[in-house]
Design a protein with these regions (language model features):
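Cysteine-nucleophile active-site neighborhood
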Residues: 267, 292-370
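Structural motif
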Residues: 5, 84-86, 115-117, 147, ...
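ATP-dependent carboxylate-amine ligase catalytic core
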Residues: 2-110, 118-142, 150, 154-157
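C-terminal and late-domain segments of enzyme folds
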Residues: 107, 237, 249-259, 266-268, ...
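Acyltransferase
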Residues: 193-237, 245-249, 415-446
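Internal gly/pro-rich beta-alpha loop/helix module
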Residues: 124-233
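Beta-strand->loop->alpha-helix junctions that form or flank phosphate-binding loops
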Residues: 37-38, 171-179, 266-274
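Phosphate-binding active sites in nucleotide-utilizing proteins
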Residues: 239-314
Length: 446
C-alpha cells in the first residue's frame, strides 16, 4: 500500500496544491486513495472530501494519544490503495517552539515516509543546504524524497542532479507553475469547495501539470497496510442526535461523528439556515463550529428554527455547541459588516468581530464541576481558532496554554456544553456520556 506524508519546510510552500494534484492523479490511476490532515484543521479534510471525493480525516497528536492516532489511521486507511497525509505549517513545527504534535512526530508515530515539497524560486544550491538541515535535525527524519513545486521542466532538469548529489535524496518529480489554479482562502483558511469557481477544471489542470515518477514513488513509499483494529459489533441505535450541517455549521470532525455512532447514536442532520424545525424524536443536539458570522442574517431570519432551538435547550435537551455553535446559542451575532442579528437567545452574551485571532492554538481545559460531558477536575486537550469573540464566554472551565497563559471559558450544566473550544471526541468518554444523556432525556421527557 502506498503510504506517505507530504510536508514542507514552511507554510506557503503549496502543500495543499500539491496534495490536490497527487490525490487527483492517484484517483485517475485507480489507486482509491484516502487522505489525512496532520493537526486540527477542519477545512483541508472538507476540501479533500467535497472537492476530490476522497475520504479524509484528521490525525492530531496533541488532541489524541499516539495509540488513538494509530487506531484511527488504521481504521480509515483500511480498504484503500493509497494513504496520503498532509502537513500543517513546517515539517518540524509543533506546539509552541517544539516538535510536539508536528508532522514529523506524526510520521515518526506511524512510521510514514515523507515526501518533502520544495519551492525552488530564488535559490539553487542553498536548497540543498536547507534540505540537509531538515534531514539531520531529527533522527530518523523519515524523509525519502523531494518534489519541486511551482517549477518549470527546465529548472527541474537543472536542479535534480545537484539536489540528489548533495542530499542523497531522489527528486521524484515536479509540479509546474499554474497561477490560475491557486486555491483561494479566507480568514479561517481555504475557501470551501463549493465556493471556488471552476474547481474541477482546476483540479484536472493540476493533475495534468504533475510530473511524477510513479514507479519510484511506489518503491519509496510502499508499506504493508496497517492492521485494521477490531471494532465493536454495531448495536441498535440508543438515541437520535440532531447534528447541524450546512454552510454555516461545517466544522465537525468526521472522527467525532463516528465516535458518536460507535457509542450508539443515530445521527440525523439538519440545517439551521433552511429547516423550520428540529428533527423529530431526538435526544440530543450537536451544534459544531463553522461560519455563522457569514450567514448571520439568514440564521436570524429563520425565526422558527431559532425558537425551536431555544425551547428545546431550555426544556433540557442535551446539547453540545462548539465555537460557531456556541455563538448561535447567544443573544446576537455581528456579521462581517458589523450588522447585529438576533440568535437563539439561550445563553447570555453576543458575538462580535475581534479583528484578530482570539485565544488561538492548543490548550488544556479543566472542568470545575460535574456536568453532562465532564467530571470535576477532568482535563481535555482543546483547540481554538476564531476571529469572533463573545461578551460572555462562560466560566465553567479553566484553560491553560503551554506558555502559562490562563483564562476561563464555557458553560456546562447537566444538559449543556457550550464554548469556543473545539473538542476532539474520538478516544474520549464524551461520546458515551452524550449518548447516555440523550437516552435519559428520551426516557423521561413528557
Amino acid at each position: 500500500m502506498i503510504q506517505f506524508l507530504i510536508a514542507a519546510p514552511r507554510s506557503g510552500s503549496g502543500k495543499t496544491t500539491v496534495i490536490c494534484a497527487v490525490l487527483t492523479a492517484l484517483q485517475r490511476r485507480g489507486a482509491a486513495p484516502c487522505a489525512f490532515k496532520c493537526g486540527p484543521d477542519y477545512i483541508d479534510p472538507m476540501f479533500h472530501r467535497s472537492a476530490l471525493g476522497v475520504e479524509s480525516h484528521n490525525l492530531d497528536l496533541y488532541l489524541s494519544s499516539p495509540d488513538t492516532v494509530r487506531t484511527l489511521y488504521a481504521r480509515y486507511a483500511a480498504g484503500h490503495g493509497a494513504a496520503v497525509c498532509e502537513d500543517a505549517m513546517g515539517f518540524y513545527d509543533g506546539q509552541g517552539l517544539t516538535t510536539r504534535a508536528s508532522a514529523w512526530e506524526l510520521a515518526d508515530t506511524l512510521a510514514l515516509p515523507v515526501l518533502l515539497v520544495v519551492q525552488p524560486k530564488g535559490a539553487s544550491i542553498t536548497l540543498a543546504a536547507e534540505l540537509r538541515g531538515l534531514l539531520q535535525f531529527r533522527t530518523p527524519s523519515h524523509i525519502v524524497g523531494i518534489l519541486l513545486n511551482d517549477c518549470s521542466e527546465a529548472l527541474y532538469k537543472t536542479l535534480r542532479p545537484m539536489l540528489e548529489a548533495e542530499t542523497g535524496l531522489p527528486v521524484v518529480g515536479y509540479l509546474s507553475h499554474l497561477p490560475g489554479c491557486a486555491i483561494e482562502s479566507r480568514h479561517l483558511g481555504l475557501k470551501t469547495a463549493g465556493e471556488i469557481v471552476d474547481l474541477q477544471q482546476k483540479l484536472g489542470q493540476l493533475a495534468d501539470a504533475l510530473v511524477l515518477d510513479w514507479a519510484q514513488l511506489a518503491a519509496l513509499t510502499d508499506r504493508p497496510a496497517p492492521a485494521t483494529p477490531p471494532l465493536a459489533a454495531p448495536c441498535a441505535p440508543l438515541a437520535r442526535i440532531a447534528v447541524a450541517r450546512d454552510e454555516a455549521f461545517c466544522f465537525a470532525y468526521a472522527e467525532t461523528l463516528d465516535a458518536l455512532r460507535d457509542a450508539g447514536a443515530e445521527l440525523v442532520f439538519f440545517s439551521p439556515l433552511r429547516d423550520a424545525a428540529l428533527p423529530e424524536n431526538i435526544g440530543g443536539l450537536y451544534l459544531p463550529g463553522g461560519y455563522p458570522e457569514l450567514y448571520a442574517r439568514q440564521l436570524s431570519e429563520n425565526c422558527a428554527l431559532r425558537a425551536a432551538v431555544q425551547e428545546a435547550v431550555q426544556n433540557g435537551l442535551p446539547t453540545a455547541a462548539e465555537c460557531g455553535g456556541f455563538l448561535y446559542l447567544g443573544q446576537a451575532l455581528d456579521d462581517t459588516d458589523g450588522k447585529v442579528y438576533p440568535m437563539a437567545g439561550v445563553l447570555p452574551g453576543s458575538g462580535h468581530n475581534a479583528g484578530r485571532l482570539v485565544r488561538f492554538g492548543y490548550a488544556a481545559m479543566t472542568a470545575k464541576a460535574d456536568s453532562m460531558l465532564f467530571r470535576a477536575g477532568e482535563a481535555l486537550p482543546i483547540h481554538e481558532f476564531h476571529h469572533w469573540d463573545s461578551s460572555e464566554n462562560g466560566t465553567d472551565f479553566s484553560v491553560r496554554k503551554a506558555e502559562k497563559r490562563q483564562w476561563e471559558c464555557g458553560f456546562a450544566t447537566a444538559n449543556l456544553y457550550a464554548g469556543f473550544p473545539h473538542l476532539y471526541w474520538a478516544g474520549t468518554a464524551l461520546p458515551r456520556r452524550f449518548v447516555q444523556a440523550a437516552q435519559h432525556f428520551l426516557k423521561h421527557k413528557g
